[in-house]
C-alpha cells in the first residue's frame, strides 16, 4: 500500500513511518527537514506543508495519509500562538483539501488529549480546531479519517522540547522540574 507520512522526520512520525515500512508498505515521508532515521526502503520529499505543489506531489497516488506535521512545544505555543494556528490548523486544512482532491482512502490525524481539555493553552486550541476540520471534511466530503489522541509521549527520538524529556533531564541532572 502507498502511504504518505506528513511530518515523518519527527519524533512520532518517524516511528510510525518505520513500522509502516516494516509491514511492507511503500512509505513516502514529507517534512521540512531531512530524517535522521530514513530507511533505505523509504522515500522523502523535503518541503513545507504550505507549498501546494510539493504537498500535492506527495499526496497524489497515496492511499492513506498520516498527518504528524504539527508544532507541539507548549512553551512555544504561548509565545507564538499565530505560528501554532497557522501550522497546526491551516497546515491540516491544506492536507485535507488535497486528500479530498486525490480521493485518499483515509486521513490519519495525530492529535492530543489536550484537544479535549482546558489545559494546554494555544496548543490545545490548535489541536481542537484541526480535529474539527478533520471531522467536518468527513461530514462534508466523506473523507474517511482516524484521529489519534495521545497523552504525554516520550521516548527515543524525542527532542529537547518534549515535556516528559524536560522533566527527566532535570531529574537526571539534579535540577528541580
Q: How would you label these PLM feature ranges?
A:
Residues 49-86, 117:
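NAD(P)H-binding glycine-rich loop region in Rossmannoid oxidoreductase-like domains
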Residues 41-51:
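Rossmann-fold cofactor-recognition segment
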Residues 122-124, 128, 132-177:
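NAD(P)-dependent short-chain dehydrogenase/reductase
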Residues 3-23:
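N-terminal Rossmann NAD(P)H-binding glycine-rich loop of SDR-like oxidoreductase domains
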Residues 6, 30, 65-69, 107-113, ...:
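SDR active-site strand-loop-helix element
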Residues 86, 90-124, 146:
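Conserved Rossmann-fold NAD(P)-dependent oxidoreductase catalytic core, especially the SDR/UDP-sugar
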Residues 51, 64, 91-94, 106, ...:
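Conserved cofactor-binding/catalytic machinery of classical short-chain dehydrogenase/reductase
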Residues 71-75, 112-120, 151-154:
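Active-site segment of SDR-like NAD(P)-dependent oxidoreductases
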